[in-house]
C-alpha cells in the first residue's frame, strides 16, 4: 500500500507539471520542416492509432526476441496465466542492475517516444508508457509484476524519452539516421503519417566530447573481522559526451525539459588485482548517466544576473566496481550566472525528494560475505533526499574551474529487504573538482579530481565506511 501511494503521488506530480504545457499554445514549439521536402511539415493532429501500434510493435518485438532468439524462461506465458493476471502479486525484483535502471527506462522511453512522435502531448505519452509497462509486467512475464519496473519504466521513461525525443530532432541536422537512432519510433510514425515529429532545433547550448585517462584508489572499512580493504585501479580510459540543452541561466518556460543537462560516460581499465571479487581483480568499469531537466522554470530579475528558479527532475545512474547507484528525484532548483568584466561565475543548488533509488549493499556487492544460495540482488531499493550543488568560474579566454557535488541520503526501507541484508540509512557524496585550459577555440586540456564517500547506518549489521579518490587528466573538444 505504501508503494502504491508513493507511485500515485509521483505520477500525479508529473501530470501536474505537464498540465501547464497542454494549457499553453504551441507558438514556441514549432514544426520541423525539411528544407528539401515540404511533405514533412507536421499537421499538428494527434495520431492515437499510430502511437498505440508503434508502442505495441516495439514491445512485441522485444518479447519475441527474448522468447524465440534467447529462449528466456520468463517469456513462457500461457493463456491461463494471462487470464488470471489480477492474481499476480507485485514484488521487488532481483534483475541485473543495468537491466533494471537503464534498459527498463529505455524500453519505457520507446513507448513514450511513440506517443510524442505521433503528436501526443506529454501527459498522453506518459500514460502510454505507463499502459505499456503495465501490460508488459502483467501479461508478458511469468515473473511477479515488478514494483521497481512499474516506476522506472513509466516515471523513468519521461526524462529519458523526452531528452531523446528532443535530441533526435537536433541530430537530424547532422544526418537523419542519427535522428532515427536516438528515436527509433520515428521510423514507424513517419511511415504512417508521412511527416516528421513536432519540435524545434538549434537548442544545443553546449556540446563537448572529452577523453579521460586516470587512476583510482579506494579504501573500504568493513565491520566484524573483515577489517579494511585497499584497492588501486592503476589506469583507465573514459570517453564522455556532455550536452547542455538551452541555457540553464535565465530560462523561463512552461515546457518540461525545454532545458536539461545530460552527461554520459564509459570507462574501462585495469582491475585492482586484489579485490574480493574475481572480475574486479581483472577489470575496472564505470558507466554513468547523469541528468537533470527543468519541468517548469521562471527567470526572476535579480540585478545583472541571469537566474532560473523552478521545478527540476534528476535521473542518475552510476555503475562501477565500487558503486551501484540510481535515482529518480523531483525537486526544486535555483541557478544563477553572475557576469564580471572578464569572466562569469555560475552556481546551482538543487534539492529533491529521492522518490526511488538504489545503492549497492556492499557486503554482497564487494564479495565480503558468503554468496547466498538463493536468487539475490547486490543492491537495495531506497528512498530519501538528493542534493546537487555546482559552482563554476570561467574566463573569456577559456579557462574554467568547476566543482560539482551530488549528495544522497538513502533509506533502505523494510518492504524491499532481503533475508540476508539489512535496512537503514546510507549517506553518499560525490564531489568533483576540475580545471581546464584552452589550447585553441575548440580544444582544451585539464585535470580532474573526484572524491566518493559512503557511510552506512544500518539497523543490525555493522556499518561500512568507503572512500574512493579518482584522479584524471582529460582532453576536451568543445563543439559548441
Feature map (PLM): residue ranges:
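Cleavable N-terminal export/targeting peptides
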Residues: 1-36, 172-173, 480
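N-terminal targeting leaders of membrane proteins
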Residues: 21-102, 107-108, 116-117, 122, ...
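Alpha-helical transmembrane segments that form the membrane-embedded catalytic/substrate-binding core
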Residues: 107-108, 140-169
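Outer-membrane beta-barrel architecture
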Residues: 113-114, 238-244, 290-296, 331-337, ...
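Small-polar-interrupted transmembrane alpha-helices in polytopic inner-membrane proteins
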Residues: 120-142, 154, 158
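Sequence/structural signature of outer-membrane beta-barrel proteins
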Residues: 136-145, 218-220, 267-277, 314-322, ...
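Outer-membrane beta-barrel "beta-signal"
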Residues: 209, 214-218, 465-480
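Intrinsically disordered, low-complexity segments enriched in Gly and acidic/Ser/Thr residues
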Residues: 349-353, 376-443
Amino acid at each position: 500500500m505504501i508503494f502504491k501511494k508513493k507511485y500515485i503521488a509521483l505520477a500525479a506530480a508529473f501530470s501536474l507539471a505537464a498540465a501547464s504545457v497542454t494549457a499553453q499554445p504551441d507558438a514556441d514549439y514549432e514544426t520541423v520542416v525539411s528544407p528539401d521536402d515540404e511533405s514533412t511539415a507536421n499537421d499538428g493532429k494527434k495520431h492515437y492509432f499510430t502511437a498505440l501500434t508503434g508502442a505495441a510493435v516495439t514491445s512485441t518485438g522485444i518479447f519475441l526476441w527474448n522468447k524465440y532468439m534467447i529462449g528466456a524462461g520468463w517469456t513462457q506465458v500461457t493463456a491461463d496465466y494471462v487470464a488470471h493476471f489480477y492474481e499476480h502479486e507485485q514484488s521487488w525484483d532481483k534483475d541485473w542492475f543495468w537491466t533494471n535502471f537503464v534498459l527498463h527506462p529505455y524500453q519505457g522511453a520507446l513507448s513514450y517516444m511513440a506517443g510524442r512522435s505521433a503528436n501526443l502531448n506529454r501527459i498522453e505519452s506518459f500514460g502510454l508508457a505507463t499502459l505499456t509497462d503495465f501490460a508488459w509486467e502483467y501479461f508478458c512475464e511469468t515473473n511477479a509484476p515488478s514494483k521497481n519496473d512499474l516506476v522506472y519504466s513509466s516515471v523513468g521513461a519521461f526524462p529519458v524519452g523526452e531528452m531523446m525525443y528532443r535530441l533526435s530532432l537536433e541530430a537530424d541536422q547532422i544526418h537523419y539516421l542519427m535522428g532515427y537512432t536516438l528515436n527509433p519510433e520515428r521510423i514507424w510514425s513517419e511511415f504512417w503519417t508521412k511527416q516528421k515529429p513536432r519540435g524545434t532545433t538549434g537548442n544545443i547550448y553546449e556540446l563537448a566530447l572529452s577523453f579521460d585517462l586516470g587512476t583510482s584508489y579506494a579504501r573500504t572499512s568493513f565491520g566484524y573481522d573483515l577489517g579494511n580493504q585497499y584497492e588501486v585501479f592503476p589506469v583507465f580510459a573514459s570517453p564522455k559526451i556532455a550536452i547542455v540543452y538551452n541555457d540553464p541561466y535565465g530560462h523561463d518556460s512552461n515546457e518540461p525539459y525545454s532545458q536539461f543537462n545530460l552527461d554520459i560516460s564509459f570507462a574501462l581499465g585495469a582491475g585492482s588485482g586484489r579485490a574480493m571479487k574475481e572480475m574486479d581483480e581483472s577489470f575496472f568499469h564505470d558507466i554513468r548517466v547523469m541528468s537533470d531537466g527543468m519541468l517548469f522554470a521562471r527567470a526572476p530579475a535579480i540585478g545583472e544576473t541571469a537566474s532560473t528558479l523552478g521545478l527540476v527532475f534528476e535521473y542518475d545512474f552510476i555503475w562501477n566496481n565500487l558503486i551501484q547507484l540510481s535515482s529518480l528525484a523531483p525537486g526544486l532548483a535555483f541557478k544563477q550566472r553572475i557576469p564580471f568584466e572578464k569572466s562569469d561565475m555560475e552556481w546551482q543548488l538543487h534539492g529533491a525528494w529521492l522518490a526511488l533509488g538504489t545503492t549497492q549493499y556492499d557486503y554482497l556487492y564487494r564479495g565480503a560475505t558468503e554468496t547466498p544460495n538463493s536468487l539475490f540482488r547486490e543492491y537495495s531499493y531506497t528512498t530519501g533526499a538528493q542534493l546537487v550543488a555546482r559552482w563554476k568560474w570561467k574566463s573569456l579566454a577559456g579557462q574554467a574551474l568547476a566543482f560539482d557535488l551530488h549528495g544522497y541520503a538513502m533509506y533502505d526501507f523494510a518492504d524491499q529487504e532481503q533475508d540476508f541484508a539489512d535496512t537503514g540509512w546510507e549517506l553518499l557524496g560525490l564531489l568533483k573538482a576540475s580545471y581546464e585550459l584552452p589550447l585553441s577555440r575548440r580544444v582544451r586540456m585539464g585535470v580532474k579530481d573526484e572524491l566518493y564517500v559512503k557511510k552506512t547506518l544500518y539497523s543490525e549489521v555493522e556499518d561500512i565506511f568507503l572512500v574512493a579518490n579518482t584522479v584524471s587528466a582529460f582532453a576536451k573538444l568543445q563543439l559548441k
